[in-house]
Amino acid sequence: MLLKINHLEVRYGRQEKPALSIERSVVFEEGERIGIIGSNGAGKTTLVKALLGLVKYRGSITTELQPEEMAAHLQFNEYVNTMSVKHIMEAILNTDIRKNKKLQELIEYFEFAPCLGKRYKALSGGQRQRFTIIMVMMQDAPLTFYDEVTSGLDFETRQKLMEMLMKWYQDKENTLCIVSHYYEELELLADKLLILDQGKLVDYGDKKELFHKYCGKSIIITDNQEKNRVLLKDFPKLASPEHLIAVSCSTVENEKIVVGCLIQNNVNFKRSNNDIEMMYMNAKNRFNEAEGEKSNEEKN
């Protein structure tokens, strides 16, 4: 066990409703890749700050790690705008790039050498993210948090950065916690998911197991058109974006029937057994329904 959360609550000021409330135990193990997912205001960054000891909380966080054994890429990382990137890097890390092979390796890996002579304010969004990632990776911490590491970047830059992160860590035992609202990033990087909604823990577990729990063995997705709604009216539906229809398939036989129906009627479709967006939507819906029922029982 690397870290254990046991009934955690965070409140800001005198607010009545907690910013974060986790009413069960959550365990992080060595080498895990944990994706933290939720809409804006769900409590993702608050959770990271609590785990880092940056905000007060009730409950318990148990770990043998020292504060210096945790590293974090937070959403807002600002440095002295007028200094060169090279000087900032060497000052914070207390090193000389020319004598630090690990730092040289990271600079080369992230193709960052052309940026060293620039002032920080002259860096693009993608370059600033790479700079901060290099600084975080230099700590080589057993537990590292990446909070919205690709926020504000264009698709191509985002994809490249995610692929570089995945490749760098693929053979390493560091535990990663990745906060992101981009589902495809979590499909690529995470093997476990921690789902938050309105400050509450919806669920936590293996990515594949959560998909099976909330979506079935597989799902078949097609456009939400009148023809398709009629064709699929007798099959079990899942919550999905308005422009799509998602059918849950509990067995291979069920899937064959759905697919056969669509092929016979010349309908394009997509099959998935790991769609995080669909899983997240259905997990959240089921959780909120259960919360609503619990609230009604308490009133009665």
What are these regions (language model features)?
Residues 1-5, 9-24:
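A short, flexible loop at the N-terminus of ABC-type nucleotide-binding domains that lies
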Residues 144-147:
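Catalytic Walker B motif of ABC-type/P-loop ATPase nucleotide-binding domains
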Residues 250-300:
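C-terminal coupling/interaction segments
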Residues 76, 81-96:
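Q-loop/switch helix immediately C-terminal to the Walker
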Residues 119-123:
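Conserved ABC ATPase signature
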Residues 37-39:
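The feature captures the beta-strand-to-loop junction immediately N-terminal to the Walker
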